[in-house]
Design a protein with these regions (language model features):
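Alpha-helix boundary/interfacial micro-motifs
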Residues: 105-106, 210, 232, 250-252
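Gly/Ser-rich, low-complexity
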Residues: 1-72, 87-97, 107-178, 217, ...
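Residue-level signal for the membrane-embedded core of alpha-helical transmembrane segments
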Residues: 65, 69-79, 103-107, 111, ...
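Membrane-water interface regions at transmembrane-helix termini and the short interhelical loops
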Residues: 81-94, 183-187, 214-216
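Membrane-embedded alpha-helices of multi-pass transport/permease systems
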Residues: 75, 120-123, 127, 185-188, ...
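Extended serine/threonine-enriched, polar tracts that run as long, contiguous segments within proteins
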Residues: 183-190, 194-197, 201-240
Length: 289
């Protein structure tokens, strides 16, 4: 009779351990997949992320915003010409060189507006190069060996009794569900960043039209800072993901499985918070506001 009870006990333990291993395998697999997914998403340029959206934004910019930018250029250049003429002792000390300077500024302003998308896409091409380099380092150094991680836990799981194993099943199931929710939030952050990039690019001709004027040029300068901040945000996101993967990799070796499971949940929450803050951090680095 006692041997039958022991066999039933072992059978139940094997079922629970199998469920725990399944949950842990899913969670660790999600970590590896998340690193690769985020690297792939933040490494895409606006053209590569969605060609149809990019084409729509480009058409809107060229057909709707560029004419407005032309009006802005006209106003800025007229203001610039009046300022240049009147500042020289009420037009008594006019030099022909200043007209050459004015024509040069006009040429630069028109060139910037007509090549706005080339300039903005160059910024994100550079950002893609940086993110791709970071993804190669981070992805290679932080990939978790799921099989090895699970093998290291088997002895500890076999020593546990049914109540503790049942508790672990509940904990791993709960944390696995939380990680799925966090994955949705991370997707929202990544998609939100790309939508912000498209919105930013759609109005780019207007700030570019102001860059040749000393007073109005602050608009264009701040726009460029924000543009670089959006591109550099991808690199900061990769750093956050790399730190997350390293923390999870070290957590696998923890002796207390209960603590390790909730540490994983805490690290995932911290990752989401860090991704939310990455945009503000990038803007503060470039002093964009």
């Amino acid at each position: 009779m006692e041997s039958i009870l022991e066999a039933i006990n072992e059978w139940i333990k094997e079922i629970l351990i199998g469920a725990i291993n399944g949950n842990l395998s899913t969670m660790f697999g999600d970590v590896n997949e998340k690193v690769g997914t985020i690297a792939a998403e933040v490494g895409k340029t606006p053209q590569g992320w969605n060609a149809n959206i990019f084409s729509m934004i480009q058409n809107l910019s060229e057909n709707v915003i560029v004419p407005i930018a032309g009006l802005v250029i006209t106003y800025v250049l007229c203001y610039e010409l009046i300022s240049m003429v009147t500042e020289k002792n009420n037009m008594h000390d006019i030099e022909t060189f200043m007209f050459f300077k004015w024509f040069f500024k006009a040429f630069v302003a028109v060139f910037l507006v007509t090549h706005t998308f080339d300039i903005t896409m160059a910024v994100f091409d550079m950002a893609q190069h940086i993110v791709s380099g970071a993804a190669g380092v981070i992805g290679g150094d932080t990939n978790i060996d799921v099989t090895e991680a699970l093998a290291a836990m088997q002895e500890g799981l076999k020593d546990m009794e049914i109540p503790e194993l049942l508790l672990l099943v509940m904990e791993t199931s709960l944390v696995s569900l939380c990680m799925k929710i966090m994955s949705v939030l991370i997707t929202v952050i990544l998609y939100g960043r790309m939508i912000e990039i498209y919105a930013y690019c759609s109005v780019s001709p207007i700030p570019f039209a102001t860059m040749t004027n000393w007073e109005w040029g602050q608009i264009g300068n701040n726009y460029l800072k924000g543009l670089f901040a959006l591109g550099f945000q991808g690199f900061l996101i990769m750093i956050c993901v790399g730190i997350y993967a390293v923390l999870v990799g070290e957590m696998v070796l923890a002796d207390n499985l209960h603590s390790a499971i909730f540490s994983l949940a805490a690290y995932t929450v911290i990752l989401c918070f860090s991704l939310f803050k990455s945009g503000a951090l990038a803007k503060s680095i470039f002093n964009a506001h």
